[in-house]
Amino acid sequence: GLFDIIKKIAESI
């Protein structure tokens, strides 16, 4: 979902 993308970016940094 949309939150999955946010979590992915959060783990990217």
From Swiss-Prot:
The record's subcellular location field reads: Secreted
Give one Pfam hit by family name: Antimicrobial20
Enumerate the UniProt keywords alphabetically: Amidation, Amphibian defense peptide, Antibiotic, Antimicrobial, Immunity, Innate immunity, Secreted
Q: Which InterPro entries match?
A: Aurein_antimicrobial_peptide
Per the record, the domain of life is Eukaryota
Biological process annotations from GO: defense response to bacterium; innate immune response
Tissue specificity is:
Expressed by the skin dorsal glands.
Q: Name one GO cellular component term.
A: extracellular region
Instruction: Spell out which residues are annotated as carrying Isoleucine amide.
Output: 13
The family annotation for this protein states: Belongs to the frog skin active peptide (FSAP) family. Aurein subfamily.
Query: What task does this protein carry out?
Result: Antimicrobial peptide with activity against B.cereus, L.lactis, L.innocua and S.uberis. Probably acts by disturbing membrane functions with its amphipathic structure. Inhibits the formation of NO by neuronal nitric oxide synthase (nNOS) at micromolar concentrations. Acts by a non-competitive mechanism, probably by binding to calcium/calmodulin and as a consequence blocking calmodulin attachment to nNOS.
Name-wise, this protein is: Aurein-1.1
Question: Which organism does this sequence originate in?
Answer: Ranoidea raniformis
